[in-house]
């Protein structure tokens, strides 16, 4: 094994190692999730060297510099003030979802008008219209961090893979017998997973365009799906009230997480893959040990259905969005509620942390998106202007751009 | 509502839930009818650029009513909403005689759609509060409704504005929910 280069990863903090093994170029990461501006650099570098043989004595200085750079980034207080940059009359029917590439240079919008459009974030110009689906384009994704491909899942039961640069369609994945409503690339960008109202999920090979495996076992619609950070496991959340953990290479069921007493609305892994967070219409979120599949905590407090939930990038914090019009922040370690976000005048259907982890973005049926302080729960900004409810909203990786997509057929760029 | 609740309404409804598709030309009064059904304010209604969904309880049924915009440019997208439809409600502006031919054409095309085959159809002859409104019988004849053989159908005169006739139509809907020939 020979180390070729070291790269920084800001969110969550870490160092990426590119190395050669048996003539093949590989990468792995050293996660520094606990890093803070006050961490002692020399001690930390010593610890890294103890566990990582690739970091030899000759690399000490370089690693120390990288850690210091990460600390500087953590010190930079992210308090970006957003203003409306552009309104895009994006589609002739309501939007479904929006997604940004990692660089934030472009983003995509899906719509009831059966298209997905690719936009230039800096100018607001339309770059491509991805046409070909015969029904609503519902689920969309970039293959981040690469960002050169786009996957679209449609109510027409197919998924299409596109070039982000040219807008050319590489493959149409056929096989589902009902609407595709969720999808994700694996982190290596070799496979795309689709979840469907037909109660199955399927994995597709990006190169060949062939189906790899079908995940069968759910008794009702699959509406949420995500890979873990390594891409080895995948979880599916279903209207059958359960979440299933699957082995992504064999398609075998690893665990069934049983405990919620209503439909699942979201299911995802924490960054270090130790925990699984599930949100449900039963008004609670549950935390599960990802290895054993046992429930370790139930997060209560909401008065109505949980419509979305998420971890921050390091996995230390959890945010929940509810039909009761409030959102909550929980500590993932103590499982205690830290703050309650109050102010929306309608249900909150989307919530996400900025990559820095100090701000939350919520989208609501009250036609506004809001920016919140994670620690105090104070609403810092109301992003107003949409004339119908907001279906989707997202931060870019730098945390200084927000895209909102609405039922009013438009999307807005805030920066 | 949010995307998630759209998915929940999309799935094949349990027995007591009914999926109703509300279609018709632009300015026929579909959204006004929807709001009248939901007992909501109808004073500020603008052309629908997409869709509206409302759930109404009636005679033990939960009626999930999908109101889809009727402007010409979005009519090609109606078919996106056909799946799992239990009842089709077609709304006509009875006072807009110039467009009877156009509305008849659209209805004929809908009735030929495979995904809507055998789905009971209720035609609302709306805007009967206007003096110039054509009576339901005249509209039925103009649209050749009596030639429909593959499903149950009904025409009901109404005014979405005043609410007159709307409940009669919905009573017919509840009676014919299960009339979809399999």
UniProtKB/Swiss-Prot annotation, chain A:
Any one Gene Ontology BP term: outer dynein arm assembly
Q: Which PROSITE patterns match?
A: WD_REPEATS_1, WD_REPEATS_2, WD_REPEATS_REGION
Tell me where the WD repeats sit in this chain: 90-129, 132-174, 175-214, 217-256, 259-298, 301-340, 343-384, 386-415
Query: Gene3D superfamilies recorded for this chain?
Result: YVTN repeat-like/Quinoprotein amine dehydrogenase
- Its domain of life? Eukaryota
What GO CC terms are in its UniProt record? ciliary basal body; cilium; cytoplasm; extracellular region; motile cilium; SCF ubiquitin ligase complex
**MF annotations from Gene Ontology:** ubiquitin-like ligase-substrate adaptor activity
Which family, according to the similarity comment?
A: Belongs to the WD repeat WDR69 family.
This molecule's function is given as: Required for axonemal dynein assembly and ciliary motility in ciliated organs, including Kupffer's vesicle, during embryogenesis. Facilitates the onset of robust cilia motility during development.
Q: How does it assemble?
A: Interacts with IFT46.
Q: What is this protein called?
A: Dynein assembly factor with WD repeat domains 1
The species is Rattus norvegicus (Rat)
* Classification of source organism: Eukaryota, Metazoa, Chordata, Craniata, Vertebrata
UniProtKB/Swiss-Prot annotation, chain B:
GO terms (molecular function) for this protein are: GDP binding; GTP binding; GTPase activity; magnesium ion binding; microtubule binding
The primary location reported for this protein is Golgi
Give the residues the record marks as binding Mg(2+): 31, 48
UniProt keywords, alphabetically? Cell cycle, Cell division, Cell projection, Cytoplasm, Cytoskeleton, Golgi apparatus, GTP-binding, Lipoprotein, Magnesium, Membrane, Metal-binding, Myristate, Nucleotide-binding, Nucleus, Phosphoprotein, Protein transport, Transport
Pfam families from the UniProt entry: Arf
Which PROSITE patterns is this protein grouped with? ARF
Give binding positions for GTP: 24-31, 48, 67-71, 126-129, 159-161
Q: Which residues carry this modification: Phosphoserine?
A: 5
Q: Name one GO biological process term.
A: kidney development
Query: What NCBIfam families does the record point to?
Result: small_GTP
The text of the family note is: Belongs to the small GTPase superfamily. Arf family.
Name listed for the protein in its UniProt record: ADP-ribosylation factor-like protein 3
Q: Which organism is it from?
A: Rattus norvegicus
């Amino acid at each position: 094994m020979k180390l070729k280069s070291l790269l920084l990863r800001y969110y969550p903090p870490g160092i990426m190692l590119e190395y050669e093994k048996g003539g093949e170029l590989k990468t792995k990461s050293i996660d520094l999730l606990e890093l803070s501006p006050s961490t002692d650099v020399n001690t930390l570098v010593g610890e890294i060297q103890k566990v990582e043989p690739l970091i030899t004595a000759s690399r000490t200085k370089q690693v120390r510099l990288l850690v210091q750079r990460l600390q500087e980034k953590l010190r930079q207080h992210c308090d970006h003030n957003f203003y409306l940059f552009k309104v895009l009359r994006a589609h002739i029917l309501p939007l479904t979802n929006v997604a940004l590439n990692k660089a934030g240079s472009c983003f995509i919008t899906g719509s009831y008008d059966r298209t997905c459009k690719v936009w230039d974030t800096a100018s607001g110009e339309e770059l491509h219209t991805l046409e070909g689906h015969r029904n609503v384009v519902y689920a969309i994704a970039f293959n981040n961090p690469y960002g050169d491909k786009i996957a679209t899942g449609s109510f027409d039961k197919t998924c299409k893979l596109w070039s982000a640069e040219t807008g050319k369609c590489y493959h149409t994945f056929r096989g589902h017998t009902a609407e595709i409503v969720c999808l994700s690339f694996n982190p290596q960008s070799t496979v795309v997973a689709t979840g469907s109202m037909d109660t199955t999920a399927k994995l597709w090979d990006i190169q060949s365009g062939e189906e790899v495996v079908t995940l069968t076992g759910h008794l009702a619609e699959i509406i949420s799906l995500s890979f873990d950070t390594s891409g080895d496991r995948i979880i599916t959340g279903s209207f059958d009230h359960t979440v299933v953990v699957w082995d992504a290479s064999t398609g075998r069921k690893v665990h069934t997480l049983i405990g919620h007493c209503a439909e699942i609305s979201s299911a995802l892994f924490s960054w270090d893959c130790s925990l699984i967070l599930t949100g449900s219409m039963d008004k609670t979120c549950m935390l599960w040990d990802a290895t054993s599949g046992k429930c370790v905590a139930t997060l209560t407090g909401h008065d109505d259905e949980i419509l979305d939930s998420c971890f921050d990038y390091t996995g230390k914090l959890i945010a929940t969005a509810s039909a009761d019009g409030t959102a909550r922040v929980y500590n993932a370690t103590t499982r205690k509620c830290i703050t309650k976000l109050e102010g929306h005048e309608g249900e909150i259907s989307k919530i996400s942390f900025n990559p820095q982890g100090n701000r939350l973005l919520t989208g609501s049926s009250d036609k506004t998106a809001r920016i919140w302080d994670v620690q105090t729960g104070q609403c810092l900004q109301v992003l107003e202007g949409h004339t119908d409810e907001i279906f989707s909203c997202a931060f870019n990786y730098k945390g200084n751009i927000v895209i909102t997509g609405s039922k009013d057929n438009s999307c807005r760029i805030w920066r | 509502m949010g995307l998630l609740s759209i998915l929940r309404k999309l799935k094949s409804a349990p027995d007591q839930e009914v999926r109703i598709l509300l279609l018709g030309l632009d300015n026929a009064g579909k959204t006004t009818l929807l709001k009248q059904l939901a007992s909501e304010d109808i004073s500020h209604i603008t052309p629908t650029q997409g869709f509206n969904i409302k759930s109404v309880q009636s005679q033990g049924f939960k009626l999930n009513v999908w109101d889809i915009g009727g402007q010409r440019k979005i009519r090609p997208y109606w078919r996106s909403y056909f799946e799992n439809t239990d009842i089709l409600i077609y709304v006509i502006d009875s006072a807009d005689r110039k467009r009877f031919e156009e509305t008849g054409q659209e209805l004929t095309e809908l009735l030929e759609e495979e995904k809507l085959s055998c789905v009971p159809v209720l035609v609302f002859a709306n805007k009967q509060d206007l003096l110039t409104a054509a009576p339901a019988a005249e509209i039925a004849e103009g649209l050749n409704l009596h030639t429909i053989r593959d499903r149950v159908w009904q025409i009901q005169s109404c005014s979405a504005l005043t609410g007159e006739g709307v409940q009669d139509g919905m009573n017919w809907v509840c009676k014919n929910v299960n009339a979809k020939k399999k």
